[in-house]
Amino acid sequence: MQSSRKIMILKRNIKGLKSSAIIATYLTLNKLFIDKFCKTQESTYPIHFVHCHFGGIKKFHSHCQLSSSYTNSGQKSFKSFNSLRFIVLKSKTCLLRYKLLIKTFCCITYSKIENLSNTRMARLTAPSKGPSFSNLNKPNDLLKAEIEDNEASHYSQNQSSDSDSDEAPEEVSLKSSSDEVKKRLQRLKGNELQLRKAEREKRRLQNERNRERNAQRVSASKLDLAILEAAEVEEINSTTEIEEKVDEASLDLYTPKGHKIVFPNNEIPKKRTRSFRKGDFKVSVLKETNDPLLAPNYEKKLSQRKRDWINRQSVPRASKRRRPLTY
């Protein structure tokens, strides 16, 4: 029942009103009033709502209507009468929440603009023609009859208007664009649900791993404590048994004499390493490889390399003879 209730926002064409003022006015609607309005039964409600804009308080009159023209198949119905066009929105779609939808499609203009310079508070009041919530408790049959009478009166007043036909291009474009926005909102909602589900699953796995780790830590600490207690008890028992069995006189037979007892905590002296005298050379033999980075003749012995170097130093270089000057 709740899903079948819809809100239809009518529009009139009034010149001289900025779109920013229209959208800002809708953003100042009270959420509690919208919820209360959407939960009522099907009827027609003329609504006054006040908005402060550019230092002055203006009173805008809009005509809102509840209707059951929303089909079960989920398609939005577009009607027109008395130069009024409206689109159907779900009652759950709060105007404050879906600002993009309102800004794009609701295109609302207002039929009455009055300056209220002395008013300081924004109030929701009923129009002068009648009370706004007078027919809340009426049965559905009477409410539907009143809606049909209002539609018939609107049709009779403007029979010659051709711009309000059901096949108007503006309505077709509105319908297509509204369907696109509806699909986009559904995709965004599905993506948000998937992200939330993945985040919940991730948190659940992390919590499960944390619980397992904590349980392992507790069990390990208990096991370590039990092992330590058992070792302590065993050590106490073994020491008491040794003290009871071993005699002090028999210990002198087994104590070593003339030998230094080295305990593990004492430093063990380092082993003596071979020290090379100055002038000695230590040659490291490299394995035969195909590595081109090695220097040539690296496989020669050190003595041969030293001998070759001495021979090179003893042989003087051939000095370059100066060429004779030729004229």
From Swiss-Prot:
* Sites of Phosphoserine modification: S163, S165
**Record's keyword terms, sorted:** Coiled coil, Nucleus, Phosphoprotein, Ribonucleoprotein, Ribosome biogenesis, rRNA processing
* A cellular component annotation (GO) from this entry: small-subunit processome
> Which InterPro entries does the record match to this protein?
UTP16 (IPR013268)
- Return one Gene Ontology term, BP aspect: maturation of SSU-rRNA
Chaperone is among the record's keywords: no
Basic and acidic residues bias: start-end ranges:
194-215
Tell me which stretches of the chain form a coiled coil: 180-219
Entry GO MF terms: snoRNA binding
Q: What is its main location?
A: nucleus
> Which cell locations does it reside in?
Nucleus, Nucleolus
Q: Which intervals of the chain are annotated as region Disordered? A: 151-218
Would you identify the family this protein belongs to, as annotated? Belongs to the UTP16 family.
Assembly and oligomerization: Component of the ribosomal small subunit (SSU) processome.
Role summary? Functions as part of the small subunit (SSU) processome, first precursor of the small eukaryotic ribosomal subunit that coordinates the first two steps of ribosome biogenesis in transcription of the primary transcript pre-RNA and pre-18S processing. During the assembly of the SSU processome in the nucleolus, many ribosome biogenesis factors, an RNA chaperone and ribosomal proteins associate with the nascent pre-rRNA and work in concert to generate RNA folding, modifications, rearrangements and cleavage as well as targeted degradation of pre-ribosomal RNA by the RNA exosome.
Identify this protein by name: U3 small nucleolar RNA-associated protein 16
What organism is recorded for this protein? Schizosaccharomyces pombe (strain 972 / ATCC 24843) (Fission yeast)
Which gene is the coding source of this polypeptide chain?
Answer: utp16
